[in-house]
Swiss-Prot record:
Keywords: Cytoplasm, Methyltransferase, rRNA processing, S-adenosyl-L-methionine, Transferase. The keyword ATP-binding does not apply. It comes from the Bacteria. Coiled coil: none annotated. Its EC number is 2.1.1.166. It catalyses: uridine(2552) in 23S rRNA + S-adenosyl-L-methionine = 2'-O-methyluridine(2552) in 23S rRNA + S-adenosyl-L-homocysteine + H(+). It comes from Buchnera aphidicola subsp. Acyrthosiphon pisum (strain APS). This is Ribosomal RNA large subunit methyltransferase E. The active site is at K164. NCBIfam families: PRK11188.1 (NF008390). Belongs to the class I-like SAM-binding methyltransferase superfamily. RNA methyltransferase RlmE family. It is found in: Cytoplasm. InterPro entries: RNA_methyltr_RlmE (IPR050082), RNA_MeTrfase_FtsJ_dom (IPR002877), rRNA-MeTfrase_E (IPR015507), SAM-dependent_MTases_sf (IPR029063).
Length: 206
């Protein structure tokens, strides 16, 4: 019965995915994933990007957020795209591959970019989803807190933190932690995010 339910969810997701207007638009316009449109909408509504920004993109694979950001910050800005998975090269984007849950890898990344002032840390990180929310949610929160830790270390004064999270157990605690570190906080759910998804975005400014 459990196997059948998982198969049903998987088939439903695949059907939705291939019928999705943003998936089709991404394919048509040589964009790496539909996540590009989420960031575009968040940016249009909140004016996140400015020319010359230095940006860290966490959970960057396959690279659609970095694709979008590189067009918005211009040649004077810099983007570091980070992920445990490999990312195909993107013009104007530096790529750092590693698992940031490993302290040595995390410290290596922080030390590598310690001389750069970052204006934006954006995180689209998510674990491999099992479909069991009691298992998935703690893993999601763990990655969110890791992104928050990185933002603490690298963000400039008035820096911006954009974080993807999910509503569920542990979210309220995470929100309180962010509220202690940032002056302005806004919770967003772009139209491009699927209606039944618990996915939300936190936009915080120092």
């Amino acid at each position: 019965m459990i196997v059948q339910k998982k198969k049903h969810r998987s088939n439903r997701w695949l059907l939705e995915h291939f019928q999705d207007q943003y998936v089709k638009a991404a394919k048509k316009n040589n964009i790496r994933s539909r996540a590009w449109f989420k960031l575009e909408q968040l940016d249009k509504n909140n004016k996140i990007f400015k020319i010359g920004m230095n940006v860290i993109d966490l959970g960057a694979a396959p690279g659609s957020w970095s694709q979008y950001a590189s067009n918005r910050i211009g040649k004077k800005g810099r983007i570091i795209a980070c992920d445990i998975l490999p990312i195909r090269p993107i013009t104007g984007v530096d790529i750092f591959q590693g698992d940031f849950r490993n302290k040595k890898t995390l410290n290596l990344m922080l030390n590598t970019f310690s001389n750069i002032t970052f204006h934006l840390v954006m995180s689209d990180m998510a674990p491999n989803i099992t479909g069991n929310f009691s298992i998935d949610m703690p893993r999601i929160i763990e990655l969110c807190k890791l992104a928050l830790k990185i933002s603490e270390h690298v963000l400039s004064k008035n820096g911006i933190f954009l974080l993807k999270s999910f509503q569920g157990e542990g979210f309220n605690e995470l929100y309180k932690e962010i509220k202690m570190l940032f002056k302005k906080i806004k919770i967003c759910k772009p139209k491009t995010s699927r209606t039944r998804s618990r996915e939300i975005f936190i936009l915080a400014t120092r």
